[in-house]
Amino acid sequence: LRFVDASVFVYAFLKPRRGLAPRESEVKERAKGIVKRINEGERVGMTVAQLVEVANLLERYMGEAAYQVEHFLLHAPNVAVYPVDWAVCAEALRVAKERRVGLADAIAYVVMTRQGVREIYSFDSDFDKLEGVRRVTE
């Protein structure tokens, strides 16, 4: 099981308003490949914080089509959505301040470490600042 970050869905689903640079096109294709594998049954996890992050971004740019993605993430048997409580948030805030990462990324990190998960699909280099986690980009 790997965790999956909101950045994967952003790159996979959002349509750019301008032409993409070659590096951006490559990242978009890799993100689509990750999403395809998840759709085909690869087991992944995320916290409710990442789910809300995905929802906010996709709803803003995709409108009602975003609900299909959200429904899949909530109901697919191969996607584990982990709860977040006050204790997770408090620990994550400490991590975020110490490592200079966003709170949502720190929440994912705290839950991952508690669950024994060591890899995350992500295009966010902030995960490289977090010990014991390997960022996977394809």
Q: Residues of each region from the PLM?
A:
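Acidic, PIN/NYN-like endoribonuclease modules and their adjacent C-terminal/linker elements
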Residues: 1, 109-138
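Short, well-structured N-terminal submotif of metal-dependent ribonuclease cores
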Residues: 1-46, 60-68
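Histidine- and aromatic-rich ligand-binding microenvironments
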Residues: 2-5, 46-48, 101-102, 124, ...
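Alpha-helix capping/helix-boundary segments
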Residues: 9, 50, 88, 108, ...
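Hydrophobic helix-cap positions at the C-terminus of alpha-helices
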Residues: 37-38, 73, 95
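Structured helix-beta-strand junction loops
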Residues: 40-41, 76-77, 98, 130
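Amphipathic alpha-helical segments within well-ordered protein domains
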Residues: 52-55, 93
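Active-site neighborhoods of divalent-metal-dependent phosphate/nucleic-acid chemistry enzymes
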Residues: 78-119
